């Protein structure tokens, strides 16, 4: 991408945004985040780029509605929690945190505390199965309900002890890690936000644009993979149709990465948390195929 604007939907602490501006001298940046602490840090970090960097406090699903779309030539989203958020005890994301928060936007009213202390057993089962892919979700929901009888659960550390730190189904990842993932996704509506972002891209007039989405677990990756496949379909007639009646020119563009791009051994060594990252890339080229 040699000109125009690139949208960094997940600004965080400015790593990707800074690299984009450093390596693309004729490109402007539009970036957003819900985390005010991250915005404050990155605003200072990117100050040297002057007006080339625009930063918004926004959900990434809403950013395209706030900016001029005509010059957008790239969209990047790095889905999930940043390492700094995980490492800050007061944010309540980590297994040893002293509180129970997990909000991306600290001004939001709904937190992990509310999920853990007010959800019914059935609601907990739903998120553990759907978002954590925990085996026997009813078992872990019951542990929380039982523990609540002795008082509110106020810390992530206590919650982790209640759920258990042993691996499940022969995996090294603990039940608590999977449960925390499920609760975090519920608190921040992470899958809904991702779906809304992809839909906002589809509904926009953005053209000749590269979309790159980095995800960290199978639920997110599946959403991205399926949406990119849908965008690449020229024919959208129902499977039972005997012949094409849609015109066969409905593709939004093409999939650039047939398989997800994964980190190299060197990248994983430098950043072990990147080991499960997957990046999928799509090139929007509406042209005569514009919907």
Task: Locate the predicted segments by residue.
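S-adenosyl-L-methionine-dependent methyltransferase catalytic core, i.e., the SAM/SAH-binding region
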Residues: 1-291
């Amino acid at each position: 991408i040699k000109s125009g604007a690139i949208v960094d939907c997940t600004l965080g602490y400015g790593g990707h945004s800074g690299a984009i501006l450093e390596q693309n001298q004729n490109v402007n940046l539009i970036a957003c985040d819900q985390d005010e602490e991250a915005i404050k840090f990155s605003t200072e970090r990117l100050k040297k780029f002057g007006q080339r960097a625009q930063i918004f406090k926004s959900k990434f699903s809403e950013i395209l509605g706030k900016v001029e779309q005509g010059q957008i030539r790239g969209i990047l989203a790095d889905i999930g929690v940043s390492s700094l958020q995980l490492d800050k005890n007061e944010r309540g994301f980590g297994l040893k945190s002293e509180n129970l928060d997990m909000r991306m936007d600290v001004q939001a009213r709904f937190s992990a505390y509310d999920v853990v202390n007010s959800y019914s057993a059935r609601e907990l089962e739903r998120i553990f199965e759907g978002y954590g892919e925990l085996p026997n979700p009813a078992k872990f929901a019951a542990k929380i309900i039982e523990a609540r009888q002795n008082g509110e659960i106020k810390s992530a550390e206590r919650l982790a002890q209640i759920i258990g730190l042993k691996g499940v189904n022969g995996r090294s990842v603990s039940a608590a890690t999977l449960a925390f993932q499920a609760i975090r996704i519920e608190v921040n509506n992470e899958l809904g936000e991702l779906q809304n972002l992809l839909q906002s891209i589809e509904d926009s007039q953005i053209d000749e644009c590269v979309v790159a989405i980095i995800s960290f677990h199978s639920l997110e990756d599946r959403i991205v993979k399926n949406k990119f496949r849908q965008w690449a379909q020229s024919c959208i007639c129902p499977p039972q149709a005997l012949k094409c009646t849609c015109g066969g020119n409905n593709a939004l563009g093409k999939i650039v990465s047939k398989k997800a791009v994964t980190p190299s051994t060197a990248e994983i060594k430098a950043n072990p948390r990147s080991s499960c990252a997957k990046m999928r890339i799509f090139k929007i080229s509406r042209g005569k195929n514009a919907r």
